[in-house]
Amino acid sequence: MNSNFFNKRAIGLVVENGIQKSRRVSGGGYFYVSGNQVNVQRGSCPRNTDYASQTILWGIDNGVTNKSLMRQRHAKQLTYRNIVGKNKNGDIIFIVSNFGGVVTIKDVIEEGVRQGIVEGVLFDGGTSVEYKFKDGWYSTSFTALSDAGKKLSGFGKPTTYIYVN
């Protein structure tokens, strides 16, 4: 899943194979892997992680929704969105838009709460939404903006993806 913008300068911390690729920014939240532990958390990320991607938007913290974020003008726009979170058992949950599934930030956060997310962060939305999920029984993928559309609009391929096996 794409977790940052279409350029080589990611916004926030990115760690790949234990090597920091970009620096932290204040605020937001993290999806990270440390050892065999996968976690989603607002506000902080351990220094020694194997993989990490920071977002500037958090949606749910300890079961409390980010009402301030939901009141922002950009949050009310209907577009493709996603939230990545964990439930009280520590299971990781991805909620993502698909073709025609344009929603507000409030919509995607509230769906996260309905699905049991207690810690959740929102990664880049709109034309940046791109994902592929595959296991032994099921596969689905989605790209908000085709490769041709990216070229025409001057976007490149995203450089930061979340990959979970």
Kindly label every feature range from the protein language model.
Residues M1-N165:
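Gly/Ser/Thr/Pro-rich low-complexity, intrinsically disordered segments
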